């Protein structure tokens, strides 16, 4: 599948830049993916697409505020404004040299486990926090892909920590907690970012009623 191919490429550590395209009318849902990609690489530019359609629905996102909160460039693209696409392409040609992207913060027990794992990981093109997170998730297929970046010591420590965490997060509770943290972070980022006003069509319908 395309999603798995994209994940494999990102996890190879070879991506110099990543462009993530989001639907302006579904920003909060799309932001979960943005945050997950930021865990793999800080070299992300966000493109908010279909701005015209969002505005017709009465939604106006504050892209400057969104960029400040995410810690990476955010550009809007509108079909009516050809300059918006040109600005995005120029930004991709001249990316910022330093970025401090927003992190997803997990429940305290999981954060403590990440802190224990990170120092045990060898240097690699991928962030230690991301690798530690994947060790805690324990997905066999992904760990196989990442095996070149994982020392035997880190793999053993990850297995031991997963077993210890099973007491506080039995069954699927650990993966559910990780997913929930991403959703909550996206909700916090989006707070106040989108201004909602009645769309023109909705106003007309109200007048007719």
Regions found by a protein language model. Give the residues of each.
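P-loop NTPase switch/communication element
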Residues: 1
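Long, contiguous hydrophobic alpha-helical segments, chiefly transmembrane helices and signal peptides
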Residues: 5, 22, 74-77, 132-136, ...
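Conserved C-terminal guanine-recognition region of P-loop GTPase G domains, centered on the G4
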Residues: 5-75
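Canonical P-loop GTPase G-domain recognition
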Residues: 52-105
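Extended helical scaffolds that flank P-loop GTPase cores
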Residues: 95-209
């Amino acid at each position: 599948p395309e999603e798995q191919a994209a994940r494999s490429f990102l996890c190879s550590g070879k991506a110099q830049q990543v462009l993530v395209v989001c639907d302006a009318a579904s920003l909060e849902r799309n932001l979960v993916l943005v945050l997950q990609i930021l865990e793999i690489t800080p070299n992300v530019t966000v493109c908010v697409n279909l701005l015209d359609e969002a505005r017709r629905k009465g939604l106006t996102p504050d892209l400057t505020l969104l960029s400040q909160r995410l810690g990476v460039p955010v550009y809007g693209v509108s079909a009516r404004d050809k300059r918006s696409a040109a600005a995005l392409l120029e930004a991709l040609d001249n990316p910022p040299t330093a970025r401090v992207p927003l992190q997803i913060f997990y429940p305290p027990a999981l954060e403590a486990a990440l802190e224990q794992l990170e120092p045990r990981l060898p240097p690699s093109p991928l962030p230690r926090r991301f690798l530690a997170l994947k060790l805690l998730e324990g997905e066999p297929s992904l760990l196989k892909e990442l095996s070149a970046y994982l020392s035997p010591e880190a793999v053993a420590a990850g297995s031991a920590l997963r077993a210890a965490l099973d007491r506080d997060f039995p069954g699927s509770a650990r993966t559910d907690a990780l997913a929930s943290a991403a959703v909550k972070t996206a909700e916090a980022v989006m707070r106040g970012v989108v201004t909602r006003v009645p769309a023109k069509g909705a106003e007309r319908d109200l007048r007719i009623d």
